[in-house]
């Protein structure tokens, strides 16, 4: 086929999800279609959350990258509440063995898109497991998440999407600050990520309008 979607092993989707996303993408000439998602317990009970996806619309790839800088940006980062045109994977691959592969790649997919169709309905059901990646506060999780955000900040700086560069760097700093303990290997990776953060901060400080106070507090 010419379209690709992903489903996490713990989750499930509405029967019509992929058909709706495909139709939205084709009708709008989009290279990707994204829907909202709902948080649920393992037995299917809804967990109240307010989604930032409130209307059907069509956005450019740059506009989607800017939404990665906004509140509740994880609705736009996750790899699974969407349908991708297959050709987007000619230039992008998920990193092997990472817990936060979507942190490393969401912006790269959006950068290739001329148009992204947004469908407001929550058709993906994100099951909240006590032992899931998103609930396990580990050094590895924090460090790998920070590394992905810093790669995104670096990319955004290179392509002058400054709002995304700022937000990604700040998010990474928050994860770095709270990454405590761990194995010697994890601590070594953390040191490398901190060095990467220092290099990006040096570049950010040269961008007019960046709030240096926030960087200083985080460090």
Predicted feature residues:
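Nucleotide-sugar donor-binding/catalytic module of glycosyltransferases
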Residues: 1-148, 154-155
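Short, solvent-exposed helix-helix connector turns and helix-capping sites enriched
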Residues: 11, 161, 218-219
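Membrane-interface aromatic/basic loop that binds lipid-linked glycans or pyrophosphate carriers
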Residues: 30, 184-219
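Residue-level signal for alpha-helical context at structural boundaries
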Residues: 51, 107, 163, 170-171, ...
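Amphipathic alpha-helical repeat scaffolds of TPR domains
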Residues: 166-178
């Amino acid at each position: 086929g010419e379209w690709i979607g992903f489903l996490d092993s713990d989750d499930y989707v509405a029967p019509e999800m992929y058909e709706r996303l495909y139709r939205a993408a084709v009708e709008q000439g989009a290279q990707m279609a994204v829907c909202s998602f709902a948080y649920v317990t393992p037995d299917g009970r809804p967990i109240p959350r307010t989604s930032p996806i409130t209307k059907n619309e069509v956005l450019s790839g740059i506009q989607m990258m800017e939404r990665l800088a906004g509140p509740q940006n994880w609705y736009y980062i996750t790899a699974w509440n969407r349908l991708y045109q297959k050709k987007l994977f000619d230039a992008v691959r998920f990193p092997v063995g990472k817990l936060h592969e979507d942190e490393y790649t969401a912006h790269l997919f959006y950068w290739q898109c001329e148009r992204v169709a947004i469908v407001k309905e929550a058709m993906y059901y994100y099951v909240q497991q006590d032992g899931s990646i998103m609930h396990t506060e580990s050094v590895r999780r924090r460090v790998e998440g920070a590394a992905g955000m810093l790669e995104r900040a670096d990319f955004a700086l290179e392509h002058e999407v400054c709002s995304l560069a700022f937000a990604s760097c700040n998010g990474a700093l928050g994860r770095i600050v709270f990454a405590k303990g761990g194995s010697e290997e994890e601590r070594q990776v953390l040191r490398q990520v901190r060095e990467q953060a220092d290099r990006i901060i040096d570049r950010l400080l040269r961008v007019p309008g960046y709030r240096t106070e926030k960087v200083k507090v985080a460090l």
